From Swiss-Prot:
Protein name according to UniProt: Antitoxin HipB
Residue range(s) of DNA binding per entry: 21-47
Example of a GO MF term: DNA-binding transcription repressor activity
Key words of the record: DNA-binding, Repressor, Toxin-antitoxin system, Transcription, Transcription regulation
PTM description: Degraded by Lon protease in vivo; half-life is 17 minutes in wild-type cells and over 200 minutes in a lon deletion strain. In vitro degradation by Lon is Mg(2+)-ATP-dependent.
Subunit structure: Homodimer. Binds operator DNA sites in the absence of HipA, inducing a 70 degree bend in consecutive operators and deforming DNA between the operators so that HipB dimers bind on opposite faces of the DNA. Forms a HipA(2)HipB(2) heterotetramer which can interact with a single operator site on DNA, inducing a 70 degree bend. When 2 operators are present each HipB dimer contacts 1 HipA molecule, which are brought together by the DNA bend and dimerize, blocking the HipA active site and inactivating its toxic activity.
Functional description taken from the UniProt entry: Antitoxin component of a type II toxin-antitoxin (TA) system. Neutralizes the toxic effect of cognate toxin HipA. Also neutralizes the toxic effect of non-cognate toxin YjjJ. Binds to operator sites with the consensus sequence 5-'TATCCN(8)GGATA-3' to repress the hipBA operon promoter; binding of HipB(2) to DNA induces a 70 degree bend. This forces HipA dimerization, which blocks HipA's active site and thus its toxic action. May play a role in biofilm formation.
Gene3D superfamilies, per database record: lambda repressor-like DNA-binding domains
Listed GO biological process terms: DNA-templated transcription; negative regulation of DNA-templated transcription; regulation of DNA-templated transcription; regulation of growth
Activity regulation statement: Degraded by Lon protease; degradation is inhibited in a HipA-HipB complex and when bound to the operator consensus sequence dsDNA.
SMART domains: HTH_XRE
Gene that produces this protein: hipB
Knockout or disruption consequences: Cannot be disrupted, suggesting it is a functional antitoxin; no visible phenotype when the hipBA operon is deleted. A hipA or a hipB-hipA operon deletion show decreased biofilm production in the absence of antibiotics.
Annotated Pfam families: HTH_3
Amino acid sequence: MMSFQKIYSPTQLANAMKLVRQQNGWTQSELAKKIGIKQATISNFENNPDNTTLTTFFKILQSLELSMTLCDAKNASPESTEQQNLEW
């Protein structure tokens, strides 16, 4: 089972998901075909995630057999809040 650090930006999220795709040995084309979207859409997500729709994001997330957990930011440590500010 793969474990990730906390993610604070769309770029970090896209990089983590790209890593999972690569570790599964899938090309962008193979993943795109699996979920019925264009390879260019996968490329756009991995390289410019700020412009990806939530629908596309969740299709990719599901196809990689990943899930997302939300955490209460009020309980974040000062260090994680500082990291979040750096990422955005």
